[in-house]
Regions:
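Bacterial N-terminal signal peptides that target proteins for export
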Residues: 1-12
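Intrinsic low-complexity/disordered segments
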Residues: 2, 23-24
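Bacterial N-terminal signal peptides
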Residues: 10-22
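Subset of outer-membrane beta-barrel
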Residues: 26-309
Length: 309
């Protein structure tokens, strides 16, 4: 079968939505390198050792499809006196004619469950701005009243929570980044912008193969109302506390290759490539994701964390 060089995702998505009689807001962004920036999906996670970190990420999904998802994100987080975590999560997500901008403040509190095991409880609160520009793209039904608008804007509150339990070599977590099921009437009861709940379960274990080599298998399960669960299984290796290599499989969706490099004591860069195996894989050249993390100087004791997560 000849694969078209470029197709319009706007047309495909809007054709389906019109037939369903419902406009859905963008769901939360998808990340392949979530293990390097867990705070994006769990407000209970922050870096340890009395320091802040700032992470920039960029994801271009389904290269070759016009209007495919594109995500830019900034996360800043840290812990004070090994007890209180503070941070912000900001992202901008584009797909077809729709754009979402989200800004959240994050607070977490750490508890010692034992000498080796800690637990963090986290909350996030903020606001999501949503826009649909109906002037973009071509539509199946040009006479639909919904598309007579030039633009649609809305702002919706967001409140989430999470829990993160960990030791030096393992972790488990549970989070709901937005517990509010938001919806807004566009024109009639059948045309709604809304977001379903996202629930994340995560876990990982670090195996010390030698003094300079660590192996970390991990899993992330994401469930969304009225949709099948998404399961990410990954395996990452850390060499000399400097280089990371990994592979990941998103069940029935994609295979991924990951690489990271600790450029200096304060800078880390990561890259991932997703090869799509779903039906839409016939029409795209994969997905790219880049992250850049800056570890700010410590303001407390200069103890190096043994964690590889």
């Amino acid at each position: 079968m000849k694969i078209p060089q470029k197709i319009s995702l706007k047309l495909l998505i809007l054709f389906l939505l019109i037939n369903l009689g419902e406009i859905m807001a963008q769901q939360l962004p998808q990340y392949t390198q979530y293990m390097y920036n867990t705070a994006t999906i769990n407000p209970a996670y922050v870096n340890e050792n009395n320091r802040m970190d700032a992470t920039l990420s960029y994801r271009a999904q389904w290269i070759g499809i016009d209007g495919a998802p594109e995500t830019k994100a900034l996360t800043v987080s840290g812990i004070i006196n090994n007890k209180i975590g503070l941070g912000i999560n900001i992202f901008k997500d584009n797909i077809g004619p729709s754009t979402e901008f989200s800004s959240n403040a994050v607070f977490s509190y750490y508890l010692n469950l034992s000498k080796k095991v800690k637990m963090s409880l986290g909350l996030n609160a903020g606001i999501d701005f949503f826009e649909v520009d109906y002037s973009k793209g071509s539509y199946y039904d040009q006479d639909d009243i919904l598309f007579s608008y030039d633009n649609y804007y809305n702002a919706l509150p967001a409140v989430g929570a999470g829990i993160y339990i960990f030791s030096d070599n393992w972790y488990v977590g549970f989070s709901v980044p937005n517990m509010l099921i938001n919806q807004s009437n566009v024109e009639s009861d059948k045309n709604l912008i809304h977001r379903d709940n996202h629930v994340y379960f995560m876990g990982g274990y670090v195996i010390d193969l030698s003094a300079s080599l660590k192996l970390k298998p991990s899993i992330l399960v994401k469930t969304i109302d009225n949709a099948p669960p998404t399961i990410d299984a990954s395996l990452n290796v850390l060499f000399l506390q400097t280089f990371t290599l990994g592979a990941s499989h998103r069940l029935k969706d994609s295979y991924s290759a990951l690489a990271g490099f600790q450029i200096s004591k304060n800078f880390f860069m990561g890259y991932s490539y997703d090869y799509s195996i779903s039906d839409i894989g016939n029409y795209n050249q994969g997905s790219h994701e880049i992250i850049l993390k800056y570890l700010m100087p410590r303001w407390g004791p200069n103890a190096r964390s043994p964690r590889f997560f």
